[in-house]
Amino acid sequence: MREPDQGVPIRMPSPHDSGAVNALLADPVFAALAEEAARDYIDWDELAKRPLPAGLSATDTWQLLTAVRRFGSTQFPIRDMRGRVYWYTLTRESSLCVDAIERHCRADSATHRAILHRHGRRFLVGSRIREAIAACQLDGVVVSPDEAESLLMSGRAPRNATDRLILNSHALLYELDDLADEPFSPELLTRLYERLIEGVDLSALERRPVRHGLTDRVESAPVTPEARAGVIQQFCAYANGETGDPTESVAIKAHALLNTAQHWEFFPDFNGIVGRCIFRLFAAQRDYPVLGYLPISSLYQSWSEGRMESSVVRFSSLDTGRSSSETEVDYTPNVLTYLQISVVALDELLGSIARARRRDAEVRSRLEHDAELNYRQRSIIAHALANPDVELRIREHQTAHNVVYATARADLLDLVDCGYLRQELRGRAFVFLPDPDLPERLGGAEEA
């Protein structure tokens, strides 16, 4: 099937064409296509499999369906480098995603309470580590995930420029909460960038090509500093709610801000990492903290590498060329993909909370005689049961539960005193190992 022609305007009917227009709208084939396109979005490949209205080519039908959907669309207030307008419609699939995000990501949600009270803490720590690593990788920095995770969990000092960048990226995710009451401004964005590159020898980083959002970058003429500064002002107005549709979903707007920062390259480098910080900060400002906790960058990465099933994310790839013209871009499939990736991340979080609750309940039932053990210690015991060869360290426990060093040390030493762990010297530091008799002592308990 031939590709749709790009940039071909649809001829507007004259009064003499009204009969033909009415006949088309009454045509059952076109009416069914228009209804489905408005509710669910029909992409070009799907249209190729459908019967077409009599007398219309596939390209004609595509353009007419786009025109019908355009009437009910939402438009982003910031154009791209080629001056094109971006718009989208909220499909039924998108609406379901927005509903899930509304229910679970707000500050007053049960999910947020679970994170604050403990059951989501381990996920939250792991999510921030994944985000710091994935955001650096998407911005073209060569990173060993295992080495980076070890760096962030151990608390050791950075040894090179890559270590420093990862530490800065990770630290920024924690520091953003302090900025939640500050409106977006060019100065705020500059502070985020300067904090990110603080102490980093940029010339020493090993780099790969940068990926921008879900689609490949479209080349355009160089942007002047004046034009970029103007876009940054528009960006801040949009982020602060001064422009744009006031009813727009927080999740959609957060993704739009992230991708605008990447597309316009606000800074000389690392616009993806800065964009991710903007995403999280905007979510916090709008009282959607859980949205900001989700490991969006790492799941973007999984999607782009083809590691997501079509049952959870509809589109395996995106080509905006099929839905764009010289003046505008239909961004509907991109918005749906962003929302579905967010829901995948949300499902991971909910699963992690459910597993933590089951583990906690099981270990609590096995430790009725040790009622004084706290939830962190029960978490250690559950982890030790599932991983009998694990080596536990104070710094890693401190990072995993966001406690001070003295508390983490006391947790582990108490478990040694109770006989659940044993302590051994490794070099100049102690590690903690599960007692060999731990499963028998707890009656064969296993991780849920």
Question: What do these predicted ranges mean?
Answer:
Residues L258-F266, G275-A448:
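C-terminal regulatory or interaction extensions
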Residues R121, N271, L373:
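Residue-level marker of regulatory loop/turn positions in helix-turn-helix DNA-binding domains and
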Residues A54-R121, G126, R130:
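Eukaryote-specific, low-hydrophobicity, charge-rich regions
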Residues R2-F76, R217-G351:
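Phosphate/pyrophosphate-binding active-site loops
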Residues R39, L90-T91, S249, N374:
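Generic structural signal for alpha-helix starts
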Residues A23-L24, E36, R50, A67, ...:
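Residues that form generic nucleotide/phosphate-binding pockets
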Residues A20, D60-Q63, T89-A107, H119, ...:
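Exposed alpha-helical structural elements
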Residues W87, H104-P268, R276-Y293:
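Active-site core of Fic-domain adenylyltransferases
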